[in-house]
Amino acid sequence: MSLFRRDGRRQETMSLTAEHVSFRYDARRESAAEFALHDVSVAVQRGSLTGLLGPNGCGKTTLLRLMAGVLQPGQGSVTLNGRSLREIPRRELARQVAVVPQETHPAFDYTVLEMTLMGRHPHLGLMQLEGPDDIAIAHESLAATGTADLAHRAFATLSGGEKQRVVIASALAQSSSVLLLDEPTASLDLAYQLEVASLLSRLNRDRGVTMVLATHDLNLAAALCDSLVLLRAGRVIAQGPPRDVLTAPLVQQLYNVEADVRFHDAAGHLTVVPIRRAR
C-alpha cells in the first residue's frame, strides 16, 4: 500500500467548497454583528493551494473548522467533491480531510514514528496501529516530509521546524487528499518558516496535495498560494490570484503595507514579492 501513485502524486484528489456559509458561536443571538462568518463562499480546486488572509478574529480559523467538519454552518453548506460534509461519517471524513494545527502538545512522550502512526487512524488508539501497512505508510509520510531520520527521536526534543514537519507527516499518514493548515509557520523563526514553506510547496507541486492555508504572513501567501481569500469581520472582501488580491487597496489598507508584486512571462508567474510596512 502506498500514499502516492508511481508518478509521485496522490492517489486521488478532492475539491472542497463552502457555499453562502454563515456561522455564529452563540446561536441564541440574532444580531448579524455576532456572526463569526457571514455569507462566505470559497471554492478550493483540487490540487490547488488556497490561502486565507485577514487580521485576528476575521474568521480564518472558523472557516477551517467548518471545512474540517468540526463545526456545522448555521446557513449554507460545505461540500467535499459535491457531497455535503453533514452526510459524510466522521471517520470517513477524517480519512479525506486532515487538519494541521498551529501548535501540537502531545500528552505523552511519543517518538516521531508513534506521532505519525497516531495520525494514520485518528479515531483509534496507538496500540491498534502496528500493522505492516500502517508502519509502511508512516515511514513513507516521514520520508515525504524529510523527517525519516527522526523516526525514533522523542517528539518533545525536536526543533520547532522539525515538529511542524512531523505534524504534517502525521496528517499525510491519514491518506487524506486535503490538508487544512492553521498558521503553520506562526511560531517559527525565519529559518524554520522557510523550511516548512518549502515542504508545503513541494507536497503541493510534486504530490498534488490540495491545501488550504490560514496565515497572517503575506509573503508566505504570495509565494505559495494559487489563490487568496481575504476576510474581514467574518466576510470575504477580496479573493483571486495573489497578484490581484495583494495589490488591492483593501489589502494594503487592512495590513498597512505597500506591496510591490512583480511577475514574469505571459502566465503571470510570481517572481518577487517584497512587502513592506507603509509609512
Spans of features found by a protein language model:
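Conserved structural motif at the start of ABC-family nucleotide-binding domains
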Residues: 16, 35-37
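Conserved ABC transporter NBD signature motif
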Residues: 76-84, 93
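Catalytic Walker B motif of ABC-type/P-loop ATPase nucleotide-binding domains
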Residues: 179-183
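The feature captures the beta-strand-to-loop junction immediately N-terminal to the Walker
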Residues: 53-55
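Helix-to-loop junction immediately C-terminal to a conserved catalytic motif
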Residues: 68
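Conserved ABC ATPase signature
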Residues: 154-158, 162
